[in-house]
Amino acid sequence: MKIIEYEERYLEDVKDLLVELEEYILTIDKDELDQLHPEYREKMAILDLKELEENNGKCFLAVEDNKAIGLIMGTIIQYDENDYLDYKCPKSGEITELIVTTKIRSTGVGQALMNKMEEYFKYLGCEYIFVDVFAYNQKGINFYNKQGYHPRMHIGIKKI
């Protein structure tokens, strides 16, 4: 297994990985608000990659036997002029996606992807890395906790 920067020849694998992640989210979404729209597979990867391009981001792939088996995407957080009113706004990266195909989870692939993204953010001079994790994704939360991440915000939801 090797970690490489995204190459277009792996686009179909990226689409498959993002669908796998969304399908997993659907199984744990107690609020039943997530969905896998018929256009998700064709559009989501393109939208994510465009966001990376616009925000000095990167996508790294874990590749084995010429197939992407995991990915991580991250961008540089863009602050606006009003953010500075109540926040110090240190240069920070944000992990926007992380998925390792089910068959090889817990084999170190996620850790290798995290290490590569953290290395990239450090290279750019980031002081912090943010990550949003779906509240019902306990496996994801546990993984990030093991990597030294801790909760900073809590977003609640209530059906009315």
State what each model feature region is:
Residues 104, 108-116:
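Conserved acetyl-CoA pyrophosphate-binding loop and the N-cap/start of the following alpha-helix
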